[in-house]
């Protein structure tokens, strides 16, 4: 039963693993464009994708949407702490975590609006 639930979240686990891997590389091999604030945009988009994936995988429990948001935000903070403590020369940054949380909030708003529109469409 436990493994069946885990397998049901394979997309979320894949996105979560990719974010952890990219965030914990000691020296990222991907050079970011020299656009001011691009790293914050990347953080926001990564956590928007993570949250939407969690919401998609947990559609059977539509009233627990907030758990996807809380989990994503806590995961973002955890990654920042790990970077600061164990992954030199990476540094934890509260502004990165704020960007993560903004991505989470946008994902939840988009999801809830989408679900309302879907429900209205199904009623007609």
Predicted regions and their residues:
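Interfacial helix-loop-helix junctions of multi-pass membrane proteins
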Residues: 33-37, 79-105
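Membrane-helix interface segments
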Residues: 7-10, 60-67, 90-94
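Short helix-capping/hinge motifs at transmembrane helix termini and TM-loop junctions
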Residues: 25-27, 59, 87-88, 115
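"…centered on the first transmembrane helix and the immediately adjacent amphipathic helix/loop
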Residues: 1-56, 68, 72
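Short, charged juxtamembrane terminal tails flanking transmembrane helices
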Residues: 119-124
